[in-house]
C-alpha cells in the first residue's frame, strides 16, 4: 500500500498550543494502576516494592522518595501507583507553584496521616518553601512566622506524617540538604524497544486501535525510549489510519504516518535534526554552549537540554564536554555529511579522550 505523506496535509495542523478536549482523560486511561501493571523499569519496581511492603508491614509511612530521569518515563505514573499501593490519597503540585513558604504551609496543613504529596519538578521549588520543607520532611512540623521585625513570632505547626514523592529531570540541580532528606532515590532509565512495544499493544487495546505487531515494533523503535512519546505517536498513527486508510495500523500505515509527522527511523524529529544541523553546519561540530545552540534553533536552552539532548547523547550523536557540546561522527553521518578526521566515532570515544559533563548537570555548558 502506497501513501503520499505530503498530499492534502496542512503543516499548520501539526502544532497546537491548546490541550484538545479529552486528551487528559486519554492520558489518565493509559496510566498503569499498579506496580504489576507497570511495564519496564524492573529494578525500580523491585526496589519500590520492597520499600512499600516494608512500610506496610511496620504500619508506618514509607521514607520520602525521589524519582529522577528524563521527561516522559513514568515518574508521575509511579507516584500515583505509590499512593494506590499504600491505599492513600495523592496530593499533586509542582515546584514552580510553590513560590512562597506560605504556599507550602497551606498544602501541608491539609494533609492527613499517610497521604502522599507529589511535587513535580521539585528542583524548581523556591528557596523559602524548600527550607520549610526540610523540617516537614524530618520532623513532620513547620514553623510559621507571624508578623515582621522585632515583633515577629514563630508558631510551630504539626504536620500529619506523610510521604513526599519528588520528581526531577535534573537531580544535579537539587540542593544537598534537600536531596539528603530522601530515603530512597529511583533512577528512571530509557526503555528498551521490546518494552515500548508491550506498552503500545496495551495502549492500543485501551484505545480500541487495531495495531498489528510489526507496526507496534516500528513505532516502538522510533519512540526514543520514552513511553510518553510512544503513546503520542500511537494516537497520531491512529488518526492517519482512520483518515487515509481502513483504520488498521499496518507496517505500511505506521511508516507513512510517521513520515508525515517528521519522525525518522531513529526517532529524531524536526527539532532534533535542527539541533544537529546547527551544531554541525553552523558551528563546525562544536564545541558550543547550550545557550548559543538554543538561540541558533530558536528554542529555550532548557528545551534543548531536557527534551533533545538526553536522546541525542544516548544515541551517541552529541557529547557533553567541559568546553561545550560536540557532534560525533554519527551526527555528521546522520545529516549525510562526511565527518572530519578528528570527529569522535561516538560517545564512548569522546568519553575516553575528554571527560563529559553529567547529562543533567546545569554547569555542563
Swiss-Prot record:
Residues binding Mg(2+): 76
Chain segments carrying region Large ATPase domain (RuvB-L): 1-191
PANTHER family associated with the record: HOLLIDAY JUNCTION BRANCH MIGRATION COMPLEX SUBUNIT RUVB (PTHR42848:SF1), PTHR42848
SMART domains named among the record's database cross-references: AAA (SM00382)
Binding site for ATP: 30-31, 72, 75-77, 138-140, 181, 191, 228
Function in brief: The RuvA-RuvB-RuvC complex processes Holliday junction (HJ) DNA during genetic recombination and DNA repair, while the RuvA-RuvB complex plays an important role in the rescue of blocked DNA replication forks via replication fork reversal (RFR). RuvA specifically binds to HJ cruciform DNA, conferring on it an open structure. The RuvB hexamer acts as an ATP-dependent pump, pulling dsDNA into and through the RuvAB complex. RuvB forms 2 homohexamers on either side of HJ DNA bound by 1 or 2 RuvA tetramers; 4 subunits per hexamer contact DNA at a time.
UniProt region (Small ATPAse domain (RuvB-S)), positions on chain: 192-262
Free-text domain note: Has 3 domains, the large (RuvB-L) and small ATPase (RuvB-S) domains and the C-terminal head (RuvB-H) domain. The head domain binds DNA, while the ATPase domains jointly bind ATP, ADP or are empty depending on the state of the subunit in the translocation cycle. During a single DNA translocation step the structure of each domain remains the same, but their relative positions change.
Lineage, broadest ranks: Bacteria, Bacillati, Actinomycetota, Actinomycetes, Mycobacteriales
Annotated gene: ruvB
Family note: Belongs to the RuvB family.
Organism (species): Rhodococcus erythropolis (strain PR4 / NBRC 100887)
Descriptive protein name: Holliday junction branch migration complex subunit RuvB
Keyword Cytoplasm: yes
Amino acid at each position: 500500500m502506497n501513501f503520499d505523506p505530503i498530499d492534502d496535509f496542512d503543516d499548520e495542523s501539526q502544532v497546537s498550543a491548546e490541550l484538545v478536549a479529552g486528551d487528559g482523560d486519554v492520558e489518565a486511561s493509559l496510566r498503569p494502576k499498579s506496580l504489576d501493571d507497570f511495564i519496564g523499569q524492573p529494578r525500580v519496581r523491585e526496589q519500590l516494592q520492597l520499600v512499600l511492603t516494608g512500610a506496610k508491614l511496620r504500619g508506618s509511612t514509607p521514607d520520602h522518595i525521589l524519582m529522577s530521569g528524563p521527561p516522559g518515563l513514568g515518574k508521575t505514573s509511579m507516584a500515583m501507583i505509590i499512593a494506590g499501593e499504600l491505599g492513600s490519597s495523592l496530593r499533586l503540585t509542582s515546584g514552580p507553584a510553590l513560590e512562597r513558604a506560605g504556599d507550602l504551609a497551606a498544602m501541608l496543613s491539609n494533609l492527613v496521616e499517610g497521604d502522599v504529596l507529589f511535587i513535580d519538578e521539585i528542583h524548581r521549588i523556591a528557596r523559602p518553601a524548600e527550607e520549610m520543607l526540610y523540617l516537614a520532611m524530618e520532623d513532620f512540623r513547620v514553623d510559621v512566622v507571624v508578623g515582621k521585625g522585632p515583633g515577629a513570632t514563630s508558631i510551630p505547626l504539626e504536620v500529619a506524617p506523610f510521604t513526599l514523592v519528588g520528581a526531577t529531570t535534573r537531580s544535579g540541580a537539587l540542593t544537598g540538604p534537600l536531596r539528603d532528606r530522601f530515603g530512597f532515590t529511583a533512577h528512571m532509565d530509557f526503555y528498551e524497544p521490546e518494552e515500548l512495544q508491550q506498552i503500545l499493544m496495551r495502549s492500543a487495546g485501551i484505545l480500541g486501535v487495531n495495531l498489528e505487531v510489526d507496526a507496534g515494533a516500528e513505532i516502538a523503535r522510533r519512540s526514543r525510549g520514552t513511553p510518553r512519546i510512544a503513546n503520542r505517536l500511537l494516537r497520531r498513527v491512529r488518526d492517519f489510519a482512520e483518515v487515509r486508510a481502513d483504520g488498521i495500523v499496518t507496517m505500511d500505515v505506521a511508516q507513512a504516518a510517521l513520515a508525515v509527522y517528521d519522525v525518522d527511523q531513529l526517532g529524531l524529529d524536526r527539532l532534533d535534526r535542527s539541533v544537529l544541523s546547527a551544531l554541525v553546519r553552523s558551528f563546525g561540530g562544536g564545541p558550543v554552549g547550550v545557550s548559543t545552540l538554543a538561540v541558533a534553533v530558536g528554542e529555550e536552552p532548557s528545551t534543548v537540554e531536557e527534551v533533545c539532548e538526553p536522546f541525542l547523547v544516548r544515541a551517541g550523536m552529541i557529547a557533553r564536554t567541559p568546553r561545550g557540546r560536540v557532534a560525533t561522527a554519527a551526527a555528521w553521518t546522520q545529516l549525510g555529511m562526511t565527518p572530519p578526521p578528528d570527529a569522535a566515532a561516538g560517545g564512548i570515544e569522546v568519553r575516553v579522550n575528554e571527560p563529559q559533563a553529567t547529562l543533567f548537570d546545569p554547569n555542563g555548558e
